[in-house]
Amino acid sequence: MEFADKTFMGDDAYNHWNAALNTGKLIQTKEHGSLHQYFIDQSHGIFDVDFDIYGPFTAEYGYEHYGKNGNNGFDKIPGDIVVEGLKAIEGKVNLSDYDWDGDGEADQVFFLYAGLGQASGGHDSTIWPHESQLRYWPCGVLKYPTGKVNTYACANELQPATQGSSNYISAGIGTICHEFSHCLGFADMYDTTGGDGYGMAIFDVMDQGPYNGNGFVPCNYTAFERIYAGWVEPIELDSPATVKDMKSVSDYGRPFIMYNSNNTNEYFLMENRQNTGWDKELYGCNGLLIVHVNYVPSRWTNNSVNASTQEIQCCTVVNADGSREMSDL
């Protein structure tokens, strides 16, 4: 979606983003791969998704109309641009094609908007990339002859070339990957209260990982996410064992799991993360990654997995030095 006062960079946004999402190489950057390939790699070939792209379309107003913050610090009416985008494709798209579970509702609708996002260099009047549901906005769930739309997500087109730079480049696929992952049911792994909970840092695309490689090389999903999605079966360790030749995540290695025998909702996950494949931009961090999980369902439902306002963090890296922070990353 373009705005009345902001258009996409370049003169071929459709083909650029079709390449980024579907065909393997970003036209302007020759980076790692497409979002389609990302999900193929994460799911061991199970989740083979193609992205149908429509547009660009132009919104009725300038970007500030949709992105301006309210008194609570959040965007006031970003849902309006979703409504306008859906109006632009009405009658051109069969929404039932995107209804994966047969409930009459398109499961994911994603909007890419022109310019910067508030989370990565844009000012307060730009839209913050997010996933949400239209039932929370004044428009409510939208109904069309071929189906309903409720869940949507959005992300920005551009980012600063370097921190604080006024030179802007394509935002890559990292933020799209993160927000689309919310559509699939994955929760944030950073401290959603804005506190000092350290979460999963660069090792998780639901934390800082979508920004790896300047957004062009989002890291692999963690063992928790791949297990949660049903894409990998962990190997249980229930007695002392010697593990050799542990394959890396990028080489489709299976993670190991060790349960608390008194509470199977608490466990440790172990996986080999090497600077290869989608993990090649882990800033030199490689080796055995151990994650401590305290599975409290409400923390995932409320998107507060690693909130510092809670007594414990529920899915965090176990540091080799025993510290409770990763400020050196």
Q: Which residues does each predicted region cover?
A:
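Extracytoplasmic/secreted proteins, especially bacterial periplasmic and envelope-associated proteins
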Residues: 12, 16, 34, 77-84, ...
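Active-site-proximal segments of metallohydrolase catalytic domains
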Residues: 29-148
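Short intrinsically disordered coil segments
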Residues: 13-16, 220-227, 287, 305-309
